[in-house]
């Protein structure tokens, strides 16, 4: 049995989020949350928030035991890029790219492992 949670349009680069995800991929959920809690990256807070949502979905929608859950799949897709302009000298302008990310976390029972 699997439970899924998706957080969309997070204002962080997908590359930065993937660096955090690589650390917790495949871990039991309680250990992953403890690991994310002590990571200094902003992406760790967003991944932890999505993971907590997936755990809640598993407990309430599928009656799964929290102690049996592990991270089956976790990935970050690129969302739309916000484009802004910054005025520069002599009437020029530079383009500023503000990337967004879609975070997906799938948790499953250890019995499925």
UniProtKB/Swiss-Prot annotation:
GO CC annotations, alphabetized: cytosolic large ribosomal subunit
GO terms (BP aspect): translation
Keyword rRNA-binding appears in the UniProt entry: yes
Pfam families: Ribosomal_L22 (PF00237)
KW Ribosomal protein (keyword) present: yes
Coiled coil: none
One example GO MF annotation: rRNA binding
Keyword terms of this UniProt record: Ribonucleoprotein, Ribosomal protein, RNA-binding, rRNA-binding
Its job: This protein binds specifically to 23S rRNA; its binding is stimulated by other ribosomal proteins, e.g. L4, L17, and L20. It is important during the early stages of 50S assembly. It makes multiple contacts with different domains of the 23S rRNA in the assembled 50S subunit and ribosome.
Protein family membership: Belongs to the universal ribosomal protein uL22 family.
Subunit: Part of the 50S ribosomal subunit.
Name under which the protein is recorded: Large ribosomal subunit protein uL22
Organism: Chloroflexus aggregans (strain MD-66 / DSM 9485)
């Amino acid at each position: 049995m699997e439970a899924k949670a998706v957080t969309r349009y997070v204002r962080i680069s997908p590359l930065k989020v993937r660096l955090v995800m690589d650390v917790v991929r495949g871990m039991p959920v309680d250990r992953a949350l403890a690991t994310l809690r002590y990571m200094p990256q902003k992406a760790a807070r967003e991944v932890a928030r999505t993971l907590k949502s997936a755990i809640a979905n598993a407990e309430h929608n599928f009656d799964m035991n929290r102690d049996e859950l592990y991270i089956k799949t976790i990935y970050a897709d690129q969302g739309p890029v916000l484009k802004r302009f910054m005025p520069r000298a002599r009437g020029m302008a530079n383009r500023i790219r503000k990337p967004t990310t879609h975070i997906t976390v799938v948790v499953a029972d250890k019995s499925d492992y």
